Amino acid sequence: QDKGDYWWELRACDYYDEFEKPKIIYPNILKRPEFTFDIKGWYTNQKCFIISIDDKYLLGFLNSKLNHYLFEKYLPKLRGGFYEPSYVFFKNFPIKKIDFMKKSEKLAHDEIIKHVDLLLQLNEELKDTKLPAKAEQIKQRIAHSEEKINQLVYQLYELTPEEIKLVEESVNG
């Protein structure tokens, strides 16, 4: 039986076990891509969505400037410049599938994962850092890894310098 005897006894979630697995978590309303990776089995409420997949390459793409640009093209804009990346709109995003037979794509994929792992580590360090100078140093390393991921994503999507400029101006402007 999946519901209780009284109205306040809500039925159990059919996908509880998905919360225990590695997954990508993101808020249901956001201004820019804010995706994180969970390996600790965090549970979320209705204010967040989860993507039940252990895929740090996808996490790197989702937080990239190119994905931010795609937000502007595919997602409806809410008041205040916010977006609601629900599945209905998100399912049409052109996420690059890696051809592992192509050495350049495999290398870019592996580099993205390396930088995502570094970013996850650096963000943990930043949370624990009390010294302003150390925090600034970590922030610079974070910015460097984010930029490396952006360049790798541009490479995978074979963007021209003009297209890269368009993306950069759109999300930085």
Residue ranges and their predicted role:
Residues 95-173:
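Non-catalytic DNA-recognition/assembly elements of restriction-modification systems
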Residues 1-104:
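Polybasic, glycine- and aromatic-enriched phosphate-binding surface used to engage nucleic acids
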